[in-house]
UniProtKB/Swiss-Prot annotation:
InterPro entries membership: Brain-der_neurotrophic_factor, Cystine-knot_cytokine, Nerve_growth_factor-like, Nerve_growth_factor-rel, Nerve_growth_factor_CS
Disulfide bonds: C142-C209, C187-C238, C197-C240
Quaternary structure and interacting proteins, as annotated: Monomers and homodimers. Binds to NTRK2/TRKB. Can form heterodimers with other neurotrophin family members, such as NTF3 and NTF4 (in vitro), but the physiological relevance of this is not clear. BDNF precursor form: interacts with the heterodimer formed by NGFR and SORCS2. Mature BDNF has much lower affinity for the heterodimer formed by NGFR and SORCS2.
Site (Cleavage): T57, S58
Upper lineage: Eukaryota, Metazoa, Chordata, Craniata, Vertebrata
Annotated family: Belongs to the NGF-beta family.
Species name: Lipotes vexillifer (Yangtze river dolphin)
Name listed for the protein in its UniProt record: Neurotrophic factor BDNF precursor form
Amino acid sequence: MTILFLTMVISYFSCMKAAPMKEANVRGQGSLAYPGMRTHGTLESVNGPKVGSRGLTSSLADTVEHVIEELLDEDQKVRPSEENNKDADMYTSRVMLSSQVPLEPPLLFLLEEYKNYLDAANMSMRVRRHSDPARRGELSVCDSISEWVTAADKKTAVDMSGGTVTVLEKVPVSKGQLKQYFYETKCNPMGYTKEGCRGIDKRHWDSQCRTTQSYVRALTMDSKKRIGWRFIRIDTSCVCTLTIKRGR
């Protein structure tokens, strides 16, 4: 976003060299403007009245200020719609179409880690040490593992109507085919919590780490051989379930 904004501003200033800017709030039909940006002045012709260097500098400064204000206003208008689609973005972030196995987690997970890094960078060294989960002795209640899997590993899945559908391994595109990859998170069968959740009082509770699922969109084929994009369930987390012990 920052690079795009700087590019637009530089291009905008290069156009200013062709003719001086007249400070006015009147827009003519022949005024130049970039898409999504409203101009606050009109460009006079080359043969028009001249403007001093000080006036031109002031005009350019005012223009930059107006552009920044408008971009911030547009950003505030877009954010509410982004918040409404947050759930859908999280669902679809675990699916990727690629010609090879992805080497990193989904972008949403990387952005979350980057945000945590920025938050930690703004802390003092002392606060940062105390906020480190490892230093505070924090451990996950259940051990989990995350990995990319293909349709060849899944083969079938359950859609939102409860029916079993076949997950297609490859998706046709204009230049060939791409494989569907799913980023799944499940309980680690080799972890230390395979016999119960960590930190639970076993005298009063029976605990178990269980893998839970969420819906993601994938290319599938139903029992009637109809191919289409459907929401299917995949493993997305490992949670702790508790049951109270009876007879005590």
